[in-house]
Every structure is written in structure tokens, then in C-alpha cells.
Amino acid sequence: HAGLFSDAEDLLRFGEWALAGALGQPVVSGLQPPKEFASWTIRQDHPAGSSRALGWDTPSGISSAGTIMSSRSFGHTGYTGTSIWIDPEREVVIILLTNRVNPTRDTPKFGLIRAVVADAVMRALFPGAPPRPH
């Protein structure tokens, strides 16, 4: 089992929904994010030092979020190399759809590719944006 599958268009809709939830804003149509959504994106520090929020990851050091997304960002990765990262501070959703298991599952440096892509997107959208403080 490799998780959930979708396409870029639907994942963008989901990302926009999550962004609205993190900002406490309503969406134009459809299911509204719960009022508690923003609290689900805050790092829980459990166990101590963990970067995990409730169902989400948050940026820490070298992560799949790259180095430019804000510390308020939250995201999730998938086994096949996919990722979604949402930055409420800059109102950005980044989706990466890949298949890291083709032709082989032996791709130990694949996590770095996610970070490179996230940084490339952020640099394109926000030229000169500084790295996130650690």
C-alpha cells in the first residue's frame, strides 16, 4: 500500500482548502475547514524534538520544505516521492508528484530533491527571499 493517489488539480484544491483553514478563512464553495484547523498545523514537540504537527510535518533543518518556506509552513510527504507543502505566511501551496520507485526503489537521496524543488519554486515566486531562520 503506497498511500492516497490523486492528480495535481485536486491536490491544489486540497492545498487551497488547507491554506484557508490555516488562515482561518472560508473557502468559496464546498466543505469549510474546521475552526480548529490552524491548531492542527502547529508543531507538537511530542516526542521532544519532533517536527510533527497533527497529521502534518513542519520544516526543520534540512527538510522536504526546503529552506525558504516560513516556519509556519506545514506539509506531508508520500512514499513514492510526492509532497505537498503549504505556507500560510506567503499563501503558497507547492505540490510535487513523482514516482521515486521507478525504475528502482534504491534512491536514498530523493528527499533532497523535494527540498531543491521547494526552494526553486519559492525563489521563482519570491526572488531574494531569505532562508528560514532555524
Description of each model-found segment:
Residues 1-134:
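Catalytic loop of the DD-peptidase/beta-lactamase superfamily, centered on the K-T-G motif
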